[in-house]
Amino acid sequence: MPYARDITKFITATEPEVGLPLLALQRSKSIIGVILLVISLLFIFIGIIILSVSSYTTTGSIFVVLSLILGGGGFFLIYKDNS
C-alpha cells in the first residue's frame, strides 16, 4: 500500500490524538519483528545444542520448529512495515 504512510501523516497533522498512536504502532511492528528474529536465533542455537549434545531429540526439534515460526513472523512484520 504506497499511500499508507501519507494517510498516517495526514491523520497525524489533522488529529494528533488519533494519528500519533498510529505512528507508534507502525514503528513498533518493526521492533517486534526484530525481537522475534533475535528470539528465533536463540531458539535455533538452543535447539542445535540440544540435538548435538544430548539424546533429547524431541525437545531439540521443538526448539528448531519454534525458531522457524518466530523467525517467519519476525520477517513478515519487518517486510510488511517496509513495504
From Swiss-Prot:
TM ranges: 31-51, 59-79
Highest taxon of the lineage: Viruses
Keyword terms: Late protein, Membrane, Transmembrane, Transmembrane helix, Virion
Protein location: Virion membrane
Induction of expression: Expressed in the late phase of the viral replicative cycle.
GO (cellular component) term, any one: membrane
Family: Belongs to the asfivirus EP84R family.
Protein name per Swiss-Prot or TrEMBL: Transmembrane protein EP84R
